[in-house]
């Protein structure tokens, strides 16, 4: 049995979770699985599983790649020689959402740190970012119960000024995160995954930021949208 979790996993143990599934930390998964199902269990970070699935039969097939997953938070993973990087403690490549991208106006992240990418581009952060904009009450976003990527992109499509300013902030943050991953892990391909990546406007803006700011003397990293965002995690969990 295989399970993907939005947590830091090291040697079959969940060692850290940020806000969700806190009872998974230190839980004896092996004992539980044997007792409940009579079978061993394999645990994996969800972004790492998604990247592995895309490398097996998706947008990163036969390449060294990194992934940035945009959802409630921001997940990431990286691979070298077709193997997921984990490091000594399981965190290598997994904390892209918590790379610091902002110093002058640092926002508090759910992890407790300030300036994290996730605090500027995770779905959970969008509502607060939008409501702090001048003119929010008169903007298209004011009609949303809670501002998320769908509401933001709808506002952008309407030409709403506040939506456009928030979009620029968020897209720039994602571009910074992409550059950080490229500089850190030297991938041939950078995958972007998650519902917001279906926006061609967002993808263009991220690609432009990367093109203008990345330093890769060997050439340009190929930035792609995940082919199978709904199924790549399952494909990555298949044990060979």
Where do the protein language model's features map onto the residues?
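Short glycine-enriched, charge-decorated loop/helix-capping segments at active-site entrances
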Residues: 15-22
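A structural motif shared across PLP-dependent enzymes of the aminotransferase-like
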Residues: 22-30
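General beta-strand structural signal in soluble alpha/beta enzymes
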Residues: 41-45
């Amino acid at each position: 049995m295989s399970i993907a979790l939005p947590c830091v996993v090291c040697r079959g143990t969940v060692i850290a979770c940020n806000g969700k599934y806190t009872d998974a930390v230190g839980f004896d998964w092996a004992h539980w699985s044997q007792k409940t199902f009579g079978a061993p269990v394999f645990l994996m970070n969800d972004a790492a599983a998604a990247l592995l699935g895309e490398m097996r039969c998706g947008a990163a097939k036969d390449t060294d790649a990194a992934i940035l997953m945009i959802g409630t938070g921001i997940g990431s993973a990286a691979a070298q020689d077709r193997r997921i990087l984990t490091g000594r403690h399981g965190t290598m490549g997994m904390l892209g959402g918590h790379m610091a991208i902002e110093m002058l106006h640092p926002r508090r992240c759910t992890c407790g740190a300030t300036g994290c990418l996730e605090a500027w581009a995770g779905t959970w952060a969008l509502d607060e970012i939008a409501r702090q904009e001048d003119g929010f009450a008169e903007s298209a976003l004011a009609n949303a119960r809670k501002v998320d990527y769908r509401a933001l992109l709808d506002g952008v499509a309407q030409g709403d000024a506040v939506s456009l300013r928030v979009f620029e902030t968020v897209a720039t943050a994602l571009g910074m995160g992409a550059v950080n991953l490229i500089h850190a892990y030297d991938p041939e391909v950078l995958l972007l995954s998650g519902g917001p990546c279906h926006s061609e406007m967002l993808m263009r803006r991220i690609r432009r930021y990367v093109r203008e700011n990345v330093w890769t003397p060997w050439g340009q990293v190929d930035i792609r949208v995940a082919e199978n965002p709904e199924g790549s995690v399952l494909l990555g969990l298949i044990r060979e």
